[in-house]
Amino acid sequence: MKLIIVKDYGELGKKAAGLVADEVKSNPKVVLGLATGGTPVGMYRELIKLHQEESIDFSQASSFNLDEYVGLAATHPQSYRAYMQENLFDHINLPAGHTHVPTGDAADLQQECASYETAIREAGGIDIQVLGIGNNGHIGFNEPGSSVESTTRVVQLTESTIEANARYFASIEEVPTQAISMGIKTILGAKKVVLLASGETKAEAVRLMLEGEATADVPASLLQHHPDVTVIVDEAAASQLTVAAANKEDKR
């Protein structure tokens, strides 16, 4: 895995957006794997800027999001579809029909999961998958213990994940307890992976991912099995790394 340490969150967003924009420029029909949560917001802001100021063209691209809460309609303000519209889709020229987010309120959730896997496969697979990392090392909503063979499925959210996401809801009781999530196998099927982490609260998970063994107990560590992973962290998220000193030259 390639490690890039940047000064702060602002630099992280710029660096990540640059990598994604390079993919769009080199392959206009790129298939993007996208993430939600707090960390990618800066990257999306920079991508919008690149689209507006440098005419980065998303018109032939397509996207697949990692996950969606079970039970939330696409119109719910805390759905990940609503997040994507607000933070990216409404501001770039990516056609609506080219964007894919799991349907959290589907009548048949198992069929929705199977159809999502089929759609990714029929698109030719994901070219570049953007990930965040949870405090417990989760990627997507693949919580500790997730199988390396897992594909898109309905998952139970852990207490720690529910607590971490409660800040987006009026109360913790409103946070869904299940989600549809791409599996570890689905994520590892992407041609490239870019994982972003910011802040001291992510430092332990980043250390375990990069310096620990590849284990289902830390789902992000399973990325060690992937041939093309770039990890971009700010100095706070890198604060527990013993290898950090060797990567000082990677700062931008």
What is the meaning of each model-derived region?
Residues 140-184:
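Class I SAM-dependent methyltransferase SAM-binding "motif I" and its flanking Rossmann-like core
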Residues 56-128, 251-252:
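Ligand-binding beta-strand-loop-alpha-helix segment within the catalytic cores
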